[in-house]
Amino acid sequence: MNKLQSYFIASVLYVMTPHAFAQGTVTIYLPGEQQTLSVGPVENVVQLVTQPQLRDRLWWPGALLTDSAAKAKALKDYQHVMAQLASWEAEADDDVAATIKSVRQQLLNLNITGRLPVKLDPDFVRVDENSNPPLVGDYTLYTVQRPVTITLLGAVSGAGQLPWQAGRSVTDYLQDHPRLAGADKNNVMVITPEGETVVAPVALWNKRHVEPPPGSQLWLGFSAHVLPEKYADLNDQIVSVLTQRVPD
């Protein structure tokens, strides 16, 4: 075999390697638009977030990237949470059962899709090689415009969307929203639009000024004193589910 034949065979083998086919296609839901946008092939996250057609059309901190495997797992986790809430409600005392029912109703119609653990900040991923994973296969990107609300959820009255205001703390948002029976009196979990979680201490003895960014979810969970042992990690499970929802 001469050198030319060897070079040709080597070139063909390289093209046929998995690396050569390591590309993804992304279906994008843009805010306020009826039709989706398809982007691809893209090799990695940087190629996705720097697409010219996406510039100024979305708010990257609120974007969520998912695939079929992540969605399937998130839906399974969500169904498990809802089943546990229903079982606990049937066993609980009347006042706590009413709180559990309220929480179940709040979570009933969530649009759960899963979230891949990737950063989507264009400025960040372009300079951090470790935050630029390859994209292989089919993905979905959900996006939003910059929000003007936060969402209050959990064992609290008046749950729902509240106007976001710069400088307001989690404690400020809880004003005029009394806790329900069995609520945690010490901490609130802040779920940022990026899916990150921050504990906000809100009791007199541990209060700390925590300002949630726009688009955050504030989860006021169940007190550890009312959670049965078999549901001891239910708050954590619910928070995990809330990080997997399609952004509003």
From Swiss-Prot:
Gene3D superfamilies: 3.10.20.700, 6.10.250.2280, Outer membrane lipoprotein wza domain like (3.10.560.10)
Keyword Cell cycle: no
Domain of life per record: Bacteria
InterPro entries: Caps_syn_GfcC_N, Caps_synth_GfcC-like_C
Keyword Transferase assigned: no
Residues spanning the signal sequence: 1-22
Keywords: Signal
Family, per entry: To E.coli YjbG.
Name of the protein in question: Uncharacterized protein GfcC
Species of the source: Escherichia coli (strain K12)
